[in-house]
């Protein structure tokens, strides 16, 4: 089953994502107000889906807005993942958009 990992998920990413609601420092994340959620398949990091319902800012000084979506670490889990997505277990990016500001 999909398990929600609420805090301290290590994902080995570089960089830093900041918003007023969230701090994601590359080693884990803080899900303070439910903006970002990690879903891990069978409590093992085979598939990592980052569900984002807000605009994320990378390096607030340059104002680049972007969306991070991680998925597809194991091809064999995709049918099960899509089954969960389609069944509504994950709220999946219906009003999130890409916007780039220089």
Swiss-Prot record:
Superkingdom: Eukaryota
Subcellular location: Membrane
Gene Ontology CC, one term: membrane
Transmembrane annotation, as ranges: 38-58, 64-84
Keywords: Membrane, Transmembrane, Transmembrane helix
Membrane topology field: Multi-pass membrane protein
Further facts: Almost completely overlaps YLH47.
Protein's recorded name: Putative uncharacterized protein YPR126C
Organism: Saccharomyces cerevisiae (strain ATCC 204508 / S288c) (Baker's yeast)
């Amino acid at each position: 089953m999909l398990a929600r990992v609420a805090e301290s998920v290590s994902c080995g990413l570089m960089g830093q994502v900041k918003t007023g609601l969230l701090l994601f420092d590359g080693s884990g994340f803080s899900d303070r107000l439910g903006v970002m959620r990690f879903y891990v398949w069978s409590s093992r990091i085979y598939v990592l889906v980052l569900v984002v319902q807000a605009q994320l800012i990378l390096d607030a000084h340059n104002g680049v807005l972007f969306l991070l979506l991680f998925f597809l670490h194991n091809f064999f889990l995709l049918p099960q993942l899509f089954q969960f997505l389609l069944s509504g277990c994950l709220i999946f990016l219906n009003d999130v958009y890409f916007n780039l500001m220089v």
